């Protein structure tokens, strides 16, 4: 059995990156949970307690914890990555992102009818809102998906171009980091703050929580969030896009060289995106649970 879970984790971690990394998801969901009312926190905890044992093991193995370790909301939000290579969940793989044609200028609601990240948020918010008093596996899954999707939609490369798989084919010619392409770099390596990165991110974002209050949840907001990420990913400093005179994005070389100050320059962008993701998740859960 231990070998079975090890293989699942290896497969999930060795494939191309299509999801914000563990650290980002944990930070978003822990911050959101901490800013819920005590009543809403209790409702989240009740749903987490209903996670089947098999899926608790999957979450813990994915996070390099002992199989029977307690599950909190931070670790539970990594569940959609822990299970996405399982046959029964393969249908959800495209839901982690939204890739558009290279000539796209902005994101609109009719750009995606199903099987993409904005629609995934709407779908699982609706499922979670149904039969609020019930504790069942369908609602538990919706909670875990929803927490995960809020992290993904705020990572700019999750709303990007189809012809290079959202930056997964844009590789580096010089970096020795474990993140071998631009999408992967923004999923994980851009969040690096040395030892205890998670604690540092939580402290930083907690201190800034009240500086940018967010409006109450409305369904049309998901397209605004996608548009925010899309415009960020098209900005010249990210080294992913060269705008032409028609404001569409020209493809960059398959291998690029990032400036030496790239991490310092752009980590502040992910700081803003993680904060917004957590605040907006808090608003959704407050309305939905």
What feature does the model see in each segment?
Residues 12-16:
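N-terminal signal peptide c-region/cleavage motif recognized by signal peptidases
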């Amino acid at each position: 059995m231990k070998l079975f879970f090890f293989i699942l984790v290896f497969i999930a971690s060795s494939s191309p990156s299509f999801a914000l990394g563990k650290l980002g998801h944990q930070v978003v969901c822990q911050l959101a949970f901490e800013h819920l009312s005590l009543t809403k926190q209790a409702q989240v905890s009740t749903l987490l307690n209903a996670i089947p044992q098999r899926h608790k093991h999957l979450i813990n193995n994915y996070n390099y914890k002992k199989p029977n370790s307690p599950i909190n909301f931070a670790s539970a939000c990594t569940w959609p990555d822990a299970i996405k290579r399982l046959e029964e969940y393969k249908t959800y793989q495209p839901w982690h992102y939204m890739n558009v044609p290279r000539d796209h200028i902005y994101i609109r609601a009719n750009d995606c009818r199903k099987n993409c990240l904005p629609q995934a948020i709407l779908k699982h918010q609706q499922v979670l809102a149904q039969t609020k008093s019930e504790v069942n596996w369908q609602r538990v899954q919706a909670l875990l998906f929803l927490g995960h999707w809020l992290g993904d939609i705020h990572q700019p490369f999750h709303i990007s171009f189809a012809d290079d798989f959202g930056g997964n084919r844009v590789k580096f010619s010089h970096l020795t980091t474990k993140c071998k392409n631009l999408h992967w770099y923004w999923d994980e390596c851009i969040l690096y703050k040395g030892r205890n990165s998670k604690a540092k991110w939580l402290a930083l974002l907690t201190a800034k929580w009240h500086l940018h209050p967010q409006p109450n949840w409305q369904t049309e907001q998901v397209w605004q969030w996608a548009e925010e990420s899309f415009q960020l990913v098209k900005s010249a400093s990210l080294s992913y896009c060269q705008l032409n005179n028609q404001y569409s994005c020209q493809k960059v070389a398959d291998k690029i060289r990032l400036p030496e100050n790239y991490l310092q320059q752009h980590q502040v962008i992910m700081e803003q995106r993680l904060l917004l993701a957590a605040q907006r998740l808090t608003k959704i859960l407050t309305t939905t649970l």
